[in-house]
Amino acid sequence: MQIDDALLQRLEKLSMLEIKDEHKESVKGHLAEVLGFVENIFALETSALKTDIELCTPLREDEPKSQPNTAKEILSQNKHSQDHYFVVPKIIE
């Protein structure tokens, strides 16, 4: 992939960055180098590789737990509570 002025301008807009004119050629060179590394990675043949680990996230059993005192403990930490709710200053009239 060739890094030209149009692509660099589009990348500037997408990233919301402004690259000064004196740095544009340097940035183009760095981007071309990075894309070269990515192309090398894509060229690797990995179909014959086998993984030593299982590539999935084990799920835990969903067990409901009753904790009836939790709400009381939380509300006891607040100075202003009423009818099992937090009382906060009114911000909208």
From Swiss-Prot:
Keywords noted in UniProt? ATP-binding, Ligase, Nucleotide-binding, Protein biosynthesis
Pfam families assigned = GatC (PF02686)
Span of the signal peptide:
none
Reaction(s) catalysed (UniProt annotation): L-glutamyl-tRNA(Gln) + L-glutamine + ATP + H2O = L-glutaminyl-tRNA(Gln) + L-glutamate + ADP + phosphate + H(+); L-aspartyl-tRNA(Asn) + L-glutamine + ATP + H2O = L-asparaginyl-tRNA(Asn) + L-glutamate + ADP + phosphate + 2 H(+)
- Compositionally biased intervals (Polar residues): 66-79
Any Gene Ontology biological process: translation
- This entry's Enzyme Commission designation comes to 6.3.5.-
Which residues form each disulfide bond in the chain?
Answer: none
- InterPro entries attached to this UniProt entry: Asp/Glu-ADT_sf_sub_c, GatC
Domain of life assignment: Bacteria
Q: Which top class of enzyme applies to this chain?
A: ligase
Q: Which GO terms describe its molecular function?
A: asparaginyl-tRNA synthase (glutamine-hydrolyzing) activity; ATP binding; glutaminyl-tRNA synthase (glutamine-hydrolyzing) activity
Listed transmembrane segments: none
**Where are the residues of the annotated region Disordered?**
60-80
Q: Which Gene3D superfamilies match?
A: Glu-tRNAGln amidotransferase C subunit, N-terminal domain
Protein function: Allows the formation of correctly charged Asn-tRNA(Asn) or Gln-tRNA(Gln) through the transamidation of misacylated Asp-tRNA(Asn) or Glu-tRNA(Gln) in organisms which lack either or both of asparaginyl-tRNA or glutaminyl-tRNA synthetases. The reaction takes place in the presence of glutamine and ATP through an activated phospho-Asp-tRNA(Asn) or phospho-Glu-tRNA(Gln).
Describe the family membership recorded for this protein in Swiss-Prot or TrEMBL. Answer: Belongs to the GatC family.
How is the quaternary structure described?
A: Heterotrimer of A, B and C subunits.
What's the protein here called? Glutamyl-tRNA(Gln) amidotransferase subunit C
Lineage start: Bacteria, Pseudomonadati, Campylobacterota, Epsilonproteobacteria, Campylobacterales
Q: Which gene is transcribed and translated to give this protein?
A: gatC
